[in-house]
């Protein structure tokens, strides 16, 4: 009778330790990748917000000029004239992770018409943040201002400074 020997000389396959090490490495790579992906999404949303503010400001000038330089339009008025697309339906549209708020000042005997637009992240903090920076533009300066902690205003520095 032959003695029982549980070891085979040419075993094939992976041990449990080797599999656990591979799974741990994959987990680390996924964790790093997700963090980088979320950071890239935030940066893309912020770039889109700046571009969108510039576009709205340009469309406001078209609206202003087509109304005998007497008025700026709300989101709804600009949508009716096809100056903005359907993403801007409503009074506070959300586009690419940013909430846009516009205030229009009508022309009066004491003031010229004007507007201000704020673009604020839909979610400003946490894992699901859609952006960090808050942006502002108005009809007087047509310069985009930025604040990294609260809604931006004209007193905040312009982008790039």
Residue ranges and their predicted role:
Residues 13-21:
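Secretory/exported precursors with cleavable N-terminal leaders
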Residues 20-36:
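Alpha-helical hydrophobic helix detector
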Residues 34-53:
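Aliphatic-rich helix starts adjacent to a transmembrane/signal segment
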Residues 58-131, 139-143, 158-161:
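Extracellular/periplasmic head regions of type IV pilus-like filament subunits
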Residues 143-151:
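Short, exposed beta-strand-loop hairpins at the edges of beta-sheets
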Residues 151-154, 159:
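A short acidic/small-residue loop/turn micro-motif
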């Amino acid at each position: 009778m032959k003695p029982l020997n549980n070891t085979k000389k040419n075993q094939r396959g992976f041990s449990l330790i080797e599999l656990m090490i591979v799974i741990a490495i994959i987990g680390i790579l996924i964790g790093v990748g997700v963090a980088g992906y979320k950071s890239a999404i935030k940066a893309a949303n912020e770039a889109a917000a700046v571009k969108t503010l510039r576009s709205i400001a340009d469309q406001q000038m078209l609206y202003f000029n087509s109304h005998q330089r007497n008025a700026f339009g709300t989101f709804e008025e600009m949508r009716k004239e096809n100056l903005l697309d359907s993403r801007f339906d409503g009074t506070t549209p959300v586009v690419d992770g940013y909430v846009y708020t516009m205030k229009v000042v009508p022309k009066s005997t004491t003031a010229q018409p004007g507007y201000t637009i704020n673009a604020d992240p839909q979610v400003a903090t946490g894992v699901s943040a859609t952006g960090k920076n808050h942006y502002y533009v108005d009809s007087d300066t047509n310069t985009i201002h930025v604040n990294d902690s609260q809604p931006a205003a004209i007193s905040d520095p312009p982008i790039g400074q």
